[in-house]
């Protein structure tokens, strides 16, 4: 059984995405692409906060409440949190981070990495 992802996996995967930097803000690690935030490791680093369109976010939380949740202060923003110990494996974490990266990345990076963060063809 694969080990569940932890904060170090979040950091390693996020920083492997193109043009990503880590910056401490609000006393926590944040990850940015071309200066735009796409992931944070809040509180005890047991969950990761990522960009997610509100409609999609609400569906995720309803479908998998043990995995996804919305922090009160983020409710009005298009962000969702994923509990690291509820993720299936590192692959799922990679998909979540890459999807958030796509939402923040500028067009030049999306054009340079057209498949990054998109579902792979089966």
Residue ranges of model-derived segments:
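Charge-dense, helix-prone N-terminal extensions
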Residues: 1-122
């Amino acid at each position: 059984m694969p080990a569940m992802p932890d904060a170090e996996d979040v950091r390693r995967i996020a920083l492997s995405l193109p043009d990503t930097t880590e910056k401490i803000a609000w006393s926590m690690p944040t990850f940015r692409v071309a200066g735009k935030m796409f992931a944070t490791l809040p509180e005890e680093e047991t969950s990761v906060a990522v960009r997610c369109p509100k409609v999609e976010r609400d569906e995720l939380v309803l479908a998998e409440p043990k995995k996804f949740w919305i922090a009160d202060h983020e409710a009005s923003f298009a962000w969702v949190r994923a509990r690291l110990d509820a993720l299936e494996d590192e692959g799922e974490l990679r998909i979540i981070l890459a999807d958030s990266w796509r939402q923040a990345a500028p067009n030049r990076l999306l054009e340079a990495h057209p498949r990054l963060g998109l579902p792979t063809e089966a």
